Amino acid sequence: RHFSKITEKMTGLLEKVKRDVIGGQSAELTVSGSAGMGISQTCRLPFIQEVYATSIAAKRLVPGTDVIIELGGEDAKILFLSGGMEVRMNGSCAGGTGAFIDQMATLLNVPLDEMDALASKYEKIYTIASRCGVFAKSDIQPLLNQGARKTDISASIFAAVANQTIAGLAQGRPIKGKVLYLGGPLTFLSQLRLSFDKALKIKGILPENSLYFVALGAAFCGTEQINIDDAIDNIKKYGVTGKFLSIPPLFENKQQYEEFKNRHESCRVKRGDISSYKGDAFLGVDAGSTTVKAVLTGKNGELLSSVYKGNSGNPVPIIKDYLLSIYNSYPDVKIACSAVTGYGEELLKNAFGIDCGIVETVAHFTAAKFFRPNVDFVIDIGGQDMKCFKIRSGAIDNIFLNEACSSGCGSFLQTFANTLGYKIEDFAKLGLFAKHPVDLGSRCTVFMNSQVKQAQKDGATVEDISAGLSVSVVKNAIYKVIRAPSADALGKNIVVQGGTFLNDAVLRVFENELGVEVTRPDISGLMGAYGAALYAMGKSSGKSSVIGKSELENFKHEVKVTNCGLCSNHCRLTINIFGGKRRFIGGNRCEKPVTKRSGQNELDMYDYKLNLLRSYKPVPGARGKLGIPMGLNMYELLPFWHAFFTSLGFEVVVSPLSSRELYTEGQATIPSDTVCFPAKLMHGHVQALVNEGIKNIFYPCMSYNFDEKLGDNHYNCPVVAYYPEVISANMRCLDGCNFIHDYVGIHRKHDFPRKMTAILGKSFSGITYAEVKKAAKAAYGAYDAYLADIRSKGGEMIREAEKRGMQIIVLSGRPYHLDPEINHGINRLITSLGAAVISEDAVSCRVRRFHTEVLDQWTYHSRLYAAAKYIGDKPDMNLVQLVSFGCGVDAITTDEVRRILEENNKIYTQIKIDEITNLGAVKIRLRSLFAALEK
């Protein structure tokens, strides 16, 4: 590994080769690899592109190779050699590469070889996103916090890498024949190779010298004798051009830094001497994504003791040791009340009998208020999450969380520090006095890797890079997460907190960017725990339920894993047992396994609609079976098509409910990883129908939807409208089927029978216009009845919720967000928090067309705007918008829905959903919303 010190490593290797191998002054030298082109051009050395080098080595060393799968440090490649060479490479994302696996091993706190050994002993595979380290952390960290075994997580990471490579790179082309595995990860990790074998249903080949195929191919292509000494001299001079984009230094001189430091050191928490303290104390714990923080405060909020540690995937032993140290060393201190916040809240609450749980945003606000009573904006940047909230009239008014990317968070900086061989504490200080901070923009870790490397090649120092990364963190927070139009939009009394703001460079950039002086408490990294302790102080009854010394000394923590069968989510549950008495169930997406409630009394339109659609059963017909893939717009139009084809004498067979297994069945035919998850699922649904032996499958292209008179037009989005074309072009399994995907316009009611008669006439004999006209009448009637049912039931649930005094959440998205595999049970999470769930189509009909600030031309999106408008004057109703990651149109809808809500002083809450199944961050967002509403 070169750790970005390319020239040093390369010259060292060449000197070793010269000394130990060739003995002479010259050799046929050819350069290859992603960093090789610049070196070859500057140093006038022969270059061969690495893909060609790999293919040449494969043809020479393993004749008859059909496919090569190669995973490197930051790149992944699939080379199809049979039938003409075709190359598939990762573009913008390094998910599923060596760097990704390294990040995951760091997260698990195990060496790579141990991770491989752990994976061989797995029992369960969890769903983990492998697109980038950030997404995977979103899945893995909560699993660790819930007590899942590292054996299962390790195997799940390898399975995710295999699935990511196949779905993201093969792009629909089958991987078969003689398949070679190359590159470091596939060479060193036997369980990763096994994951590929299982996913592809093959036995891949790991050839001898699999690490060196690019170098071997380059050697086989050598034609020119190069003087090694000259090459070494040229490489040593390579790269220092000084030509990189830079920005002004953070501090002009050390005096300016000292003034800055003194100003911020004035905001200090009062401290007490725990060794002499007697009486009631209050415990606050913040179980974050990567760290655990705990504080003990006195009766006046003075800080008596604290701990701040990386949780290494399990916060339980850290809190156990902390409590024991207090009991053993300070017997006069009595814990009168305790509170816990963060990802590991429920785990620690159940493990140690902690009195209260508090949502993170409220904990941080409570602490911020203690230091600056008139605070109007709080920003907290942690390891992989960012929380910002505006305060109005002493209550949280608006919340911003990073949805899908942690490029503005602490783990982003830590990853770079580790990559460059520094501890994060040392790396952070390097940038303070950088002469020319590199301008890196505000992009994600993967994009920035290449920019950092290029800047290094151009002569940027590590100091310049450290400062540049601090700038990018702040810009990402302000312009990507908060999306502030100006500095004034944030507020005048800003409190910053979280471990990342302990970095003086980040703090300086933040103040410079906003042009304001902010408050950073000296316990910036402990604010969540401190806020929890203050909250506990306010809730104290004098006696805490935290377990005592004797029970703590005999404390044991055991973990079991099982599948839940109480609802269609089939969650993989992690059962934590503490000392045989208490237990905590993690991994559940609803409350059924915890409370054993049936859910029959819950007011949930999502469940109601899903059950309604599942009630459409096949009716045997003379014309045989016809399959409909149950996804995308079929979640809206199933009643229409079911009535239509049943009337024509077809037995309508609908594909099964989505599941991870169904997705995996179709993933090899997905041609692009950028399409939204609901569209990706369609491949699995079509495959399921084919596997069932259905020979006629109906999935039409539909440019237009029904016109509900709410917008300027009534299109379907391009993915919904034309995805049948993608299915037809990429799924070879349809070769033996009659796949009907003609263009249909159900909005043209009078024209529809004639069009459908022509379409069906191409595939079936004997279908008359009269039959189709009759079927069309049945279809439109069934659809109207379905809509009437939804609207009526929605009204009924709203009235019942009002009668019970419940909060009502209009969970707004697309019809296909009903799919439990897509929404991950968010509707049930909301009902478990005591609110009713209404869908947007149940209320959008109650609004007449109104002016919007955007072109309103999509039927489903018009409903979103109408739902936002409808709840504007309803005090007990609020809206939560579901957004599928990768949805281009929602870049527009989210801003417009936010605008409509904020015009009516409503809080806008957005939840981005895709393959990631863990709802830790979602729960924080929803609980924050409810906490704000209570105020």
Language-model features and meaning:
Residues R1, T65-S82, G272-L304, V375-R392, ...:
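Gly/Thr-rich phosphate-binding beta-strand-loop-beta motif of the actin/hexokinase/Hsp70
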Residues S34-A35, L169-A199, S210-V214, T341-G344, ...:
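Glycine-rich phosphate-binding loops at beta-strand->alpha-helix junctions
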Residues N90, A94-I101, N300, C405-L413, ...:
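An N-terminal assembly and electron-transfer interface module characteristic of large anaerobic redox
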Residues A119-D152, N163, G431-D464:
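A mobile "lid/hinge" subdomain adjacent to the ATP/sugar-phosphate binding pocket shared
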Residues F3-S4, G83-K124, S210-V214, F220-E224, ...:
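Glycine-rich phosphate-binding loop plus the immediately following alpha-helix
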Residues G98-Q103, P207-T241, T366, G410-T415, ...:
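Glycine-rich phosphate-binding/hydrolytic loop that grips phosphoryl groups
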Residues R1-E50, R193-E208, Q225-I358, V509-D522, ...:
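N-terminal glycine/serine-rich phosphate-binding loop of ATP-dependent small-molecule kinases
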Residues K16, D20, I153-G177, A218, ...:
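Phosphate/ATP-binding catalytic cores across multiple sugar-kinase/actin-like superfamilies
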